[in-house]
């Protein structure tokens, strides 16, 4: 399969730079996986699409203010983007500088350069940085960090982004990008879903900066997926198995929930799905056999991204590309702060040939 098979024309005017004033007021494009039929509506239509006993699986990761500015003590300006927190004093990060710092280099971070840190080691494209400070890494980031808005939201972060670029149910700090499908859920909608009898469960996948890395190979099968830490606890496993047993659907909110659930299913030895606490490099593209997820809530993704490949594996390649074409024609808003899709699984997707 060629990466270019997943390309589509997107006018820049359709990239959302700010979210809707109300989280749940965005538009919703529904795609029926088996038939490819499309329905246009608003996000709160989810209430009519979900049945009592269906299980919504959310990702409760919390975005950390992961972007730091500063300079090397020796002079040059640097920009640090945290990939993950290693412990209370150390991070693994991407560093942008005219000349990469060497191990032992002293870094002065924060807009006022008040935080002292040391680059201790290099791991491929990533840098290990230790903070010489009595505070924890998280406290330091909350104090001097900027929200790591995706590169296509081409503006500096604002104070409001600390709340807007965060789901209302976020709980566990560690992500450097929001699980964006979840941004559309507000408390009133969650309350109505609960009142209808929709079940809810929470996985954790700390989204890494790798999620924005372009696929740099021509052939999909050659792509090496970035690694992210995921947790699928026992209560989620129990909820999934119970939903399946009573004939209800498991509905993943976002591609990160999909990747968490399907990673746990892939690693399971005895059951459909078992608890999972580990790094995952799962790469889902057409031909992938889904085991757990029956329906998906997701935003519109970048052309040629691993996420549009994941959706194509779920709904079918042709149905997905047709839906994206319709979304562009109907002027849906794209990417992290944009509109959403509700997609049901297409069991024939696994047999579809792509790019022929």
Swiss-Prot record:
Q: Which domain of life is it from?
A: Bacteria
For the protein in the UniProt heading, the enzyme class is transferase
MF terms per GO, please?
A: S-adenosylmethionine:tRNA ribosyltransferase-isomerase activity
Which pathway? tRNA modification; tRNA-queuosine biosynthesis
Q: Which reaction does it catalyse?
A: 7-aminomethyl-7-carbaguanosine(34) in tRNA + S-adenosyl-L-methionine = epoxyqueuosine(34) in tRNA + adenine + L-methionine + 2 H(+)
Subcellular location per the Swiss-Prot or TrEMBL entry: Cytoplasm
Entry's family note:
Belongs to the QueA family.
Checking HAMAP family in the record gives: QueA
Q: What is this protein called?
A: S-adenosylmethionine:tRNA ribosyltransferase-isomerase
Q: Which organism is it from?
A: Escherichia coli O8 (strain IAI1)
Could you read off the lineage of the organism from its UniProt record?
Bacteria, Pseudomonadati, Pseudomonadota, Gammaproteobacteria, Enterobacterales
């Amino acid at each position: 399969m060629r990466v270019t098979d997943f390309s589509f024309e997107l006018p820049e005017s359709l990239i959302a730079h700010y979210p809707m004033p109300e989280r749940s007021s965005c538009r919703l494009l529904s795609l029926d996986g088996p038939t490819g039929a499309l329905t246009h509506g608003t996000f709160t239509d989810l209430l009519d699409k979900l049945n009592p006993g269906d299980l919504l699986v959310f990702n409760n990761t919390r975005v950390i203010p992961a972007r730091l500015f500063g300079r090397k003590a020796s002079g040059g300006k640097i920009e640090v983007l945290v990939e993950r927190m290693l412990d209370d004093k150390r991070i693994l990060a991407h560093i942008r500088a005219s000349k990469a710092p060497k191990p032992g280099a002293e870094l002065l971070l924060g807009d006022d350069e008040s935080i002292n840190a040391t680059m201790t080691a290099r791991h491929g494209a990533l840098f290990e940085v230790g903070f010489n400070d009595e505070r924890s890494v998280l406290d330091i980031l909350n104090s001097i960090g900027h929200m790591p808005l995706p590169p296509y939201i081409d503006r500096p972060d604002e104070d409001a982004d600390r709340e807007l670029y965060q789901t209302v149910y976020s709980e566990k700090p560690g992500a450097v990008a929001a699980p964006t499908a979840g941004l559309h859920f507000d408390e009133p909608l969650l309350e109505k879903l609960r009142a209808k009898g929709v079940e809810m469960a929470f996985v954790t996948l700390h989204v890494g900066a790798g999620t924005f890395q372009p696929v740099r190979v021509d052939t999909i099968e050659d792509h090496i997926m970035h690694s992210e830490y995921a947790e699928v606890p026992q209560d989620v496993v129990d909820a999934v198995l119970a939903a399946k047993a009573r004939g209800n659907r498991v509905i993943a909110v976002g591609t990160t929930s999909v990747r968490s659930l399907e990673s746990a299913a892939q690693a399971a030895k005895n059951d459909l799905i078992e608890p999972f606490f580990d790094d995952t490099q799962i790469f889902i593209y057409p031909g992938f056999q889904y085991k757990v997820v029956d329906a998906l809530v997701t935003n519109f993704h970048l052309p040629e991204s691993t996420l549009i490949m994941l959706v194509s594996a779920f709904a079918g390649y042709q149905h997905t590309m047709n839906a994206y074409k319709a979304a562009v024609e109907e002027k849906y808003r794209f990417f992290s702060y944009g509109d959403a899709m509700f997609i049901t699984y297409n069991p024939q997707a696994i047999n579809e040939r792509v790019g022929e």
